[in-house]
């Protein structure tokens, strides 16, 4: 009889602890919350942040909230994106206790926690979960993206430019799936034709997959940027420490453009593109190196290399590329837009894009890569 009583008490304690941790995350606005507390007191959590600007800001808030809801045992947290596991964070009981007793700061917690891109074991534990709280499925976000392009043929004369606002409706469907519908509103440009018109932007359905062992996949179909419509498949592998990522992408598209004569014109000529990619991250200096070898839409082959320095939410980098006998280069940067947190109710949000990304391309020896 006493054995059954102990089992019942442990089960009730586990349910209570699981509910407390989940409630803390739900109060922050986290979505797709899954929690499992084992008999030994260890707790595994999965959550998705669609509230805070920047992944790491939301993760930090979630870590603090989860530790406040803990009453013993180790903590394992899986960060989701479109319900697909991306990152695993581990904290031992000693660190959690010292933080709650104010013996160490949150900064010291960050330095002692474990971070891995290997989420397989944690997701195996979460298969025992009973339900998912605050699901993102069916929620709609209206996101306004600024678009700016400057392209020069010489260093002293502006050649072409445009400034657009491109609001998009983004809706989470089922696990890994998202529907996007975007309209582009021109603000200023010295280009002609469709660039002066209100026109469709990205209208696409994407499906992501987590294949385990560090492999992730994505399939996207619809209307893309650069006047292309079709489908694209991508596969990538990343190591557990996140320092190396290898990938491949292939697609087939036709031309999709807004014309004066025919309206929205869609061609029948299918063009193929493909690329092999590699990315290396150096955490000591927050440097990211990217290399890509590709076959482009019109049959030419080329290589491109990027070097990007990350400063928290800011990033700036340079790139160089060689294709079809021509050498080109330029720089790019990303800065956060105002607003660190958005209010998201059951229906969704209306917000500005989290980052403003921009690049300027200069043609070496007067050559421009289109």
Language-model region placement:
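Short loop/turn motifs that connect adjacent beta-strands in outer-membrane beta-barrel proteins
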Residues: 130-141, 172-178, 210-216, 240-246, ...
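Flexible, glycine-rich linker and terminal segments associated
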Residues: 79-128, 283-290, 296-299, 310-317, ...
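Outer-membrane beta-barrel initiation region
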Residues: 20-204, 267
């Amino acid at each position: 009889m006493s054995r059954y009583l102990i089992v019942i008490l442990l089960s009730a304690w586990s349910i209570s602890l699981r509910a407390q941790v989940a409630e803390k995350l739900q109060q922050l606005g986290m979505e797709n919350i899954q929690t499992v507390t084992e008999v030994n007191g260890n707790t595994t959590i999965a959550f998705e942040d669609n509230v805070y600007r920047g992944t790491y800001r939301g993760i930090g808030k979630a870590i603090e909230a989860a530790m406040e809801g803990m009453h013993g045992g180790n903590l394992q947290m899986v960060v989701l994106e479109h319900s697909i596991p991306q990152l695993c964070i581990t904290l031992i009981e000693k660190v959690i206790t010292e933080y709650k007793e104010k013996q160490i700061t949150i900064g010291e917690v960050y330095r002692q926690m474990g971070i891995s891109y290997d989420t397989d074991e944690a997701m195996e534990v979460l298969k025992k979960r009973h339900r998912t709280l605050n699901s993102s499925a069916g929620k709609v976000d209206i996101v306004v993206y600024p678009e700016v392009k400057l392209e020069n043929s010489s260093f002293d004369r502006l050649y072409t430019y445009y400034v657009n606002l491109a609001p998009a409706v983004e809706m989470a469907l089922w696990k890994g799936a998202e529907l996007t519908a975007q309209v582009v509103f021109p603000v200023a440009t010295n280009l002609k034709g469709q660039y002066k018109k209100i026109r469709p932007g990205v209208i696409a359905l994407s499906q992501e997959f987590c294949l385990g062992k560090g492999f992730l996949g994505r399939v996207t179909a619809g209307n893309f940027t650069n006047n292309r419509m079709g489908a694209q498949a991508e596969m990538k592998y990343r190591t557990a420490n996140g320092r190396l990522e290898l990938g491949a992408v292939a697609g087939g598209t036709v031309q999709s453009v807004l014309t004066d004569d025919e309206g929205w014109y869609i061609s029948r000529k299918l063009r193929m593109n493909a690329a092999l990619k590699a990315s290396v991250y150096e955490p000591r200096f927050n440097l990211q190196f990217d290399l890509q070898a590709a076959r482009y839409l019109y049959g030419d082959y080329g290589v491109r290399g990027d070097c990007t320095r990350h400063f928290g939410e800011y990033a700036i980098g340079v790139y160089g590329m060689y294709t079809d006998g021509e050498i080109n280069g330029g720089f790019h940067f990303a800065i956060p837009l105002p607003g660190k947190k958005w209010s998201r109710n059951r229906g969704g949000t209306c917000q500005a894009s989290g980052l403003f990304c921009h690049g300027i391309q200069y043609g070496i020896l007067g050559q421009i890569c289109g």
